[in-house]
Amino acid sequence: MNSYDPQDTGSQQEETVALKGHFYGVYLLCSQSLDPRYRGKCYVGFTVNPKRRIRQHNLGCDFGGARKTSRKGPWLMVMIVHGFPNNTVALQFEWAWQQPSLSTRLKMYPELKRKLPRETFFDYNFRILSHMLGVGPWNRLPLTVRWLETDYERPFSKTLPNHMEIVSGKVSISASQRRRPDDAVPPPPVAWASECHLCMQQIEQPEKSRLGCTNQMCRLTCHMVCLANYLLGDETGHYIPVGGECPLCETRLSWAALLQRKRLLMGVPEELQDHDEDLSDDIDVDSDIEDGAQELSN
C-alpha cells in the first residue's frame, strides 16, 4: 500500500478533508529564511489544523506561533504525519521525533543522535522519521505520511509497514460531516443487530462498545473487544489489531477505518463544533530537535 514514487502524478492528492476533532498531525517545518543562520533549519510540531498552524508560525509568537520559529522564517510545512488515534499518542510521537537520543524507543540507535557531516537538517529529520515508522509502537499505527511540498518529496530508505500510506497533497479540516447541501440525500440508517455476532451476547451501551463492518451491505455487529480479539487471531503481545478480514463478509478491514466509521456515525461533539479555536496547537510547540536547537535559537 505504501509504494510511492515522487514522480508518479497518480499518487498526488489535491486535498483530503478530515473531520474536526479527529485530526492529529505531527509536522516538519523547513526555514526559507534569507539569513544563512536560519535557512534550512527544521522544526517539529503538533497540530490539529495544519493551515492555521503554519500561518501562526509565519506571523510570529505574538500571533500563536512558536518562540523558536519567530523571526526565523518564512517557514514551509513540508510534510505531516497523521492518523494518530488521539492527541496523546501524537504528542508522544512529536517528542520522540524531536528528542531521539532521549526517547526510550530510539535511544538504542546511536546513528540518530546527531546530524551527519554535510547532512542537511531536513535529511537528518527525515532519517529519524524513517526509523520511527519501523519501530513499535508506531509501526502498528495506521499512519499516513503526507508530503505537502513537492520539492522535498523523496522515497523512504526503509520499507514502511504495509498498512501505512504515503501520499501527497494538502489537508483541510471540515467543521462537521453534517454540513450537506440542502438537496443532498442523507445516508441510510445502519441496521444493527442487538447481539454480538462473535460472542452472541447482548451489546450493552452500543454507542461505546459496538463496531460494524465498513462494507455498507454487511450487517456485522460486534463488541469492540470481540472484534479486536478476532482480528488479532494468534498474534500475541498486542491488544489493538492493525486489520484483518470481516468475519461475516470477508471484506478487508482496517482498524483505523472501523474506528473512524464509529466516530462518524456518532457525530461530532457539540463542543468541537463550536470551539475550533480551543483545539490548541500550543502543547510542547516550543521544543526543538536536540541537534541544531541551539543554532536555531542563536
UniProtKB/Swiss-Prot annotation:
Pfam families: GIY-YIG, SLX1_C. One of its GO terms (biological process) is double-strand break repair via homologous recombination. InterPro entries: GIY-YIG_endonuc (IPR000305), GIY-YIG_endonuc_sf (IPR035901), Slx1 (IPR027520), SLX1_C (IPR048749), SLX1_endonuclease (IPR050381), Znf_RING/FYVE/PHD (IPR013083). A zinc finger (SLX1-type) spans 196-249. Catalytic subunit of a heterodimeric structure-specific endonuclease that resolves DNA secondary structures generated during DNA repair and recombination. Has endonuclease activity towards branched DNA substrates, introducing single-strand cuts in duplex DNA close to junctions with ss-DNA. Belongs to the SLX1 family. This is Structure-specific endonuclease subunit SLX1 homolog. It comes from Drosophila sechellia. The gene is slx1.
